[in-house]
Amino acid sequence: MNNDTSKKLGTLVSDDGPVNVYVWDMDETLILLRSLLNGTYAESFNGSKDVKRGVEIGRMWEKHILKICDDFFFYEQVEECNEPFLDSLRQYDDGKDLSRYEFKQDDFSTPTDDLNKRKLAYRHRAVAERYEKGLCPFIDSESMSGLDELYNVTDEYTDRWLSSARAFLEQCSCVEESSDGTSAIEQSSQDIHILVTSGALIPSLVKCLLFRLDTFLRHENVYSSIDVGKLQCFKWIKERFNHPKFRFCAIGDGWEECAAAQALQWPFVKIDLQPDSSHRFPGLTPKTVSYYFAAVYGNSDADSSKE
């Protein structure tokens, strides 16, 4: 662990107790998309949900995700160049000012050499900067209203799955409202949220923006396991937060994150789509997850204070 990493960890660790690191899956965990598209979400309700309506909602999300990926996040150029996280090529980035850089005219191609790796690193830096600014600089008010409406329609159709998942993240984070109505995480927050998705990196970042998760998931905490596997991503996360006070818990619906968590002896919370399950949204709470932490790491004052 280098000095910079040690300093960053020092700002996250206090004398108040352990720091919980929540390692999330995305689809069918923090959001619903795949199960809308293939109908499995609606089918789990045994006829009380309109399957076709769910598919329509999922297709609308797909359309918006791909458009924003292509229009603002270079996805047409980098689709075949997926990396596990945005900083993976930082060593090739020379820090060039990108404010007037012509991304469409730099002859970027598959990064098999240092020059194209640098060009890809430029794109990753630009993506990170755009992600941190949110959608407002790129989307007009009419389009934003349409996205808000789609979010609300989806939340209603899914019985508040989206807003309940977001509320979970908010309860585990110190969130401050700014004068312009936006939210920001206080640096003193004792919990960390990390996303490890089996989807491609750029679309996953765009999903975070569209599903209002970017307040809680910074770009450096979003990983794509599609090429390297979830176990490797989990190992990187464990290495990043290499301090006795950090406690890890994986939350997802798939076998791969379960196996990866077991390999590292982390607690794992299995998300279940079934309507009568408590391990879904709404239903899952920080209090419930605190029992999983306690089972592996023992009780703490922080656990007993969860509501």
Curated annotation (Swiss-Prot):
Mg(2+) binds at residues 25, 27, 253. Keywords: Hydrolase, Magnesium, Metal-binding, Protein phosphatase. Changing residue 257 to Q: Reduces phosphatase activity 45-fold. The keyword Protein biosynthesis does not apply. This is Protein phosphatase EYA. Coiled coil: none annotated. The gene is EYA. Its cofactor is Mg(2+). NCBIfam families: EYA-cons_domain. InterPro entries: EYA, EYA_dom, EYA_dom_sf, HAD-like_sf. Belongs to the HAD-like hydrolase superfamily. EYA family. The keyword Hydrolase applies. Signal peptide: none annotated. It comes from Arabidopsis thaliana (Mouse-ear cress). Its EC number is 3.1.3.48. It is an enzyme of class 3 (hydrolase). Optimum pH is 5.5. Changing residue 25 to C/E/N: Abolishes phosphatase activity.
